[in-house]
Amino acid sequence: MKRPKLKKASKRLSCAKRYKIQKKVREHNRKLKKAAKKQGISRKAKKDIGVPNSAPFKEEVLREAEQRKQELETLKEQNKIVKQQEKAAKRKKEKDAASSVKEPAAKKAKKAAKIKEARAAIVKVKSAKTFKCQELNKVIEASDVIVEVLDARDPLGCRCPQLEEMVLKHEGKKKLLFILNKIDLVPKDNLEKWLHFLEAECPTFLFKSSMQLKDRTVQQKRQQRGTNAVLDHSRAASCFGKDFLLQTLNDLANKKEGETMLKVGVVGFPNVGKSSIINSLKEMRACNAGVQRGLTRCMQEVHITKKVKMIDSPGILAALSNPGSAMALRSLQVEEKEESPQEAVRNLLKQCNQQHVMLQYNVPDYRSSLEFLTTFAMKHGLLQKGGVADTELAATTFLNDWTGAKLSYYSRVPERQGLPSYLSDAIVTELQSDVDMDAVKKGNENVKRSVRFPNLASCISFDSSGPTAGVLDVSELPKEILTKAATTTDAEEEKMDTTTNTDEPEAESHISSTVEPIQEPTEKRKDKPAKEVKFVPVNTDLTSMQNKNNEDAYDFNTDFV
C-alpha cells in the first residue's frame, strides 16, 4: 500500500509473507543445483592440490608445470601481436586504397615545397652579404664623419685597413675617429698603452656604453619633461664618455658650412657596440642591440641633437683570408652555419693563455678544446639526455662570453713599426687638427678616473692576430657562394620546368594540394565505413523465459500482486 504524501511505497511485510518468499527461493535454488549436477556443470573451480612432498620427482614436475605456463603466456602474447599486425596491415591497406588517387598531386606538392625552401635558403645566403655590403657603402657615402668602433679588449683586431683606406681616400674628405668601447673590461695600464698607440694615428675617444636602457617612446619622454616628474638617472648612470664625445661632434657640426645636420656614420665589426653607443648617446633604446651578433642588418638614422645625426650600420664582413681566431670573434660564420661552434672555440683557445682560462672558468687542466668544452658543459649543467655533455651549446655559450660585454680579457700592444701604408704624417695632423685634442685628452682622463677597471690577475691574456681584413665591395665576395647559388637556382628551375611539362594535366590538382592537409582529417572520416547497427530481438517477458526453462520457477508477480 502506498503511503499518503510519499512517493515510494513501504517495504514492510508481514513475517508470514517474508518467510514464504525465502522458502520459495531456497527451493528454487535447490532445484537449479540439482539440474546442474545432473548435467555435470559445477560453478566452483577445482582446487589444485599441488604435488605432494612424497612424490619422487616433485621438482621436475613443478619445473615442467612452470615451463608449460610460460609457453602458454608466450603463445598468448604472440597471438596478440599477430592480431595487432593484422589490424595494422588492414588499416594501412584501406588508407593506401583511399589515398592512391591523391598520391601524384601530393608528391608534386611536396617536391615543389622542397625546391622552394632550397631556393629561398640560397637566395637568403646570397643576398644577405651583398645587402650588408651595399648598406655599409651607403652609410660611408652619406656620412660626413666616420666613427670606427673598436673593442678595447682587442683594438687592433677590430681595425679594418680596407675601410680606413676607403674613408681617407674618399673624394669628400671625410673625417675619421676612433671610439674605444667596453673599456671597463680591460686593465687600466693596458688601456692607457692602447690609447697612446691609437692617438698617434687618429683621434681616439674612450667610451663605456650603458647597459640599463629601457624602451621609451618620444611621447613618454615629452610627458615626463612636461610634468616635471623625477628623472630616472639610473638609466644612463653607467655610461661614460658621452659628454665630451657629444661636445666634439657639436663642434664639428658648427664648423660645417651650411645649415645641414652633421651625419656621423658608426661602423665596425659585429658586436663591438655600435648600436649600444647610439642608444647611450640618445639615452633610450633607439637601435636594436643585444648579445646576439649581427642584429643590425640595414642602415638606421637616429637624431641625437639638433645638429648631429648618427647612422647605424651593419657589421663589416670579415674576409675568409683572416686567421681562425679573428673569424671566430669578428665574423658571423657560426651564426650562418658556415662553421661549427666547436671549431671556433678551438681556434680561439689557441690564442689564449691556458692558465688564465682555467682560473677564469674554474676548470681543471685540459689537453684539447673538446676536453675543455666537456668540463665546461658539466660545470654549467649543459647536458643532453643520459647526462651526456652538450659540447655545441657549451661552445655557443663560450663564444657569447667572448663577444658579449661580460668577459674580461686583454691583448698586448705591439711595437710601433711606422704608420700604415694608407696613412701619412700629413693625414694624421689633418685629422688631429679638426678636433680639439686637448679637450679629448682631458675627457679621456675624466673617463679613466670614473670607470672601475678590473685587476690584471682576473683577466685572460689574448694574443691578437693583427688587423682584420674586411670585404667592402660586392665584387670582393667569395665567388664560390655566388656561383654555387647561381648553378643551384638554374638547376632547380630546370627541374621545375621538366616536372611542370611532364605533369601538365595535374596543374589543377597541384593547386588543390595546398589545401589538402587541412581537409585530410574530414576525408579520413568519410572514407571510414560506418558501423552498421544491428537490432537483436530480445524477449523481455521474464515469466515466459522462466516457465520455458523450468516450470516450477518462483514468480513474484503472480503470488504477491
UniProtKB/Swiss-Prot annotation:
<protein>
    <recommendedName>
        <fullName>Guanine nucleotide-binding protein-like 3</fullName>
    </recommendedName>
</protein>
<dbReference type="InterPro" id="IPR050755">
    <property type="entry name" value="TRAFAC_YlqF/YawG_RiboMat"/>
</dbReference>
<feature type="region of interest" description="Disordered">
    <location>
        <begin position="28"/>
        <end position="58"/>
    </location>
</feature>
<feature type="region of interest" description="Disordered">
    <location>
        <begin position="76"/>
        <end position="110"/>
    </location>
</feature>
<keyword id="KW-0539">Nucleus</keyword>
<dbReference type="GO" id="GO:0045664">
    <property type="term" value="P:regulation of neuron differentiation"/>
</dbReference>
<dbReference type="InterPro" id="IPR014813">
    <property type="entry name" value="Gnl3_N_dom"/>
</dbReference>
<dbReference type="GO" id="GO:0005730">
    <property type="term" value="C:nucleolus"/>
</dbReference>
<dbReference type="GO" id="GO:0042127">
    <property type="term" value="P:regulation of cell population proliferation"/>
</dbReference>
<dbReference type="InterPro" id="IPR027417">
    <property type="entry name" value="P-loop_NTPase"/>
</dbReference>
<feature type="region of interest" description="Disordered">
    <location>
        <begin position="486"/>
        <end position="532"/>
    </location>
</feature>
<keyword id="KW-0175">Coiled coil</keyword>
<feature type="binding site">
    <location>
        <begin position="268"/>
        <end position="275"/>
    </location>
    <ligand>
        <name>GTP</name>
    </ligand>
</feature>
<feature type="compositionally biased region" description="Basic residues">
    <location>
        <begin position="28"/>
        <end position="46"/>
    </location>
</feature>
<feature type="compositionally biased region" description="Basic and acidic residues">
    <location>
        <begin position="76"/>
        <end position="88"/>
    </location>
</feature>
<feature type="compositionally biased region" description="Basic and acidic residues">
    <location>
        <begin position="521"/>
        <end position="532"/>
    </location>
</feature>
<feature type="domain" description="CP-type G">
    <location>
        <begin position="133"/>
        <end position="319"/>
    </location>
</feature>
<dbReference type="InterPro" id="IPR006073">
    <property type="entry name" value="GTP-bd"/>
</dbReference>
<dbReference type="Pfam" id="PF08701">
    <property type="entry name" value="GN3L_Grn1"/>
</dbReference>
<feature type="coiled-coil region">
    <location>
        <begin position="53"/>
        <end position="98"/>
    </location>
</feature>
<keyword id="KW-0342">GTP-binding</keyword>
<feature type="binding site">
    <location>
        <begin position="312"/>
        <end position="315"/>
    </location>
    <ligand>
        <name>GTP</name>
    </ligand>
</feature>
<comment type="similarity">
    <text>Belongs to the TRAFAC class YlqF/YawG GTPase family.</text>
</comment>
<dbReference type="Pfam" id="PF01926">
    <property type="entry name" value="MMR_HSR1"/>
</dbReference>
<dbReference type="GO" id="GO:0005525">
    <property type="term" value="F:GTP binding"/>
</dbReference>
<comment type="function">
    <text>May play a role in regulating cellular proliferation.</text>
</comment>
<dbReference type="GO" id="GO:0005634">
    <property type="term" value="C:nucleus"/>
</dbReference>
<dbReference type="GO" id="GO:0000467">
    <property type="term" value="P:exonucleolytic trimming to generate mature 3'-end of 5.8S rRNA from tricistronic rRNA transcript (SSU-rRNA, 5.8S rRNA, LSU-rRNA)"/>
</dbReference>
<dbReference type="GO" id="GO:0003407">
    <property type="term" value="P:neural retina development"/>
</dbReference>
<dbReference type="GO" id="GO:0007096">
    <property type="term" value="P:regulation of exit from mitosis"/>
</dbReference>
<keyword id="KW-0547">Nucleotide-binding</keyword>
<dbReference type="InterPro" id="IPR030378">
    <property type="entry name" value="G_CP_dom"/>
</dbReference>
<feature type="binding site">
    <location>
        <begin position="181"/>
        <end position="184"/>
    </location>
    <ligand>
        <name>GTP</name>
    </ligand>
</feature>
<dbReference type="InterPro" id="IPR023179">
    <property type="entry name" value="GTP-bd_ortho_bundle_sf"/>
</dbReference>
